[in-house]
């Protein structure tokens, strides 16, 4: 196999790995988006009812009344907590959602570009394989007539 063909196969492999990593990143972003949306919904509900469902584990929950539903305590690092107004946290989370959506669009665009390149390289490799096969058949045909 010539060097150019080997390079195309290697490029194809690299591009496929890139697409896979980007798709994994998209999945992670989707999980973060879902988590933020749930948190925003919970805080919105908390503002009106003062009641929240606390997870106990294994799919079980308990309803609880919140003493101060206007304040949210955020973990901002290892053993570091920060108290903020619920409206401020909701706004921060919505801003984070916007940023995640923008990142998601960029990654999706990159996946599309990389996938097009994969398709282009595959097409070239298929043409070369067909040409090699045709050349091989032609050689066999000529050697059989001797």
Swiss-Prot record:
Q: Where in the cell is it found?
A: Cytoplasm
Q: Which InterPro entries match?
A: PFD_alpha_archaea, Prefoldin, Prefoldin_subunit_alpha
Q: Which Pfam families match?
A: Prefoldin
Cellular component GO terms held in the UniProt record:
cytoplasm; prefoldin complex
Q: Which GO terms describe its molecular function?
A: unfolded protein binding
Span of the secretion signal? none
Q: GO BP, one example?
A: protein folding
Q: Does the keyword Cytoplasm apply?
A: yes
Question: What does the UniProt keyword field contain?
Answer: Chaperone, Cytoplasm
Mind telling me which CDD domains this protein's record contains?
A: Prefoldin_alpha_GimC
Name the domain of life: Archaea
Similarity annotation? Belongs to the prefoldin alpha subunit family.
- Classification via NCBIfam families: prefoldin subunit alpha
Tell me, in a sentence or two, what this protein's role is.
Molecular chaperone capable of stabilizing a range of proteins. Seems to fulfill an ATP-independent, HSP70-like function in archaeal de novo protein folding.
Q: Which HAMAP family match?
A: PfdA (MF_00308)
Q: How does it assemble?
A: Heterohexamer of two alpha and four beta subunits.
What is the designated name of this protein?
A: Prefoldin subunit alpha
């Amino acid at each position: 196999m010539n060097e150019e063909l080997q390079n195309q196969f290697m490029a194809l492999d690299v591009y496929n790995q890139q697409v896979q990593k980007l798709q994994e990143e998209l999945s992670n972003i989707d999980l973060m988006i879902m988590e933020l949306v749930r948190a925003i919904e919970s805080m919105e509900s908390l503002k009106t009812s003062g009641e929240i469902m606390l997870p106990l584990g294994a799919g079980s929950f308990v309803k609880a009344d919140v003493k101060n539903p206007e304040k949210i305590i955020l973990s901002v690092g290892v053993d570091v907590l920060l108290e903020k107004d619920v409206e401020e946290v909701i706004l921060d989370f919505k801003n984070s959602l916007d940023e995640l959506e923008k990142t998601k669009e960029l990654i999706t665009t990159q996946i599309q570009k990389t996938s097009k390149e994969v398709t282009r390289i595959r097409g070239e490799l298929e043409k070369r394989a067909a040409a090699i096969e045709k050349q091989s058949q032609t050689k066999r045909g000529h050697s059989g007539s001797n």
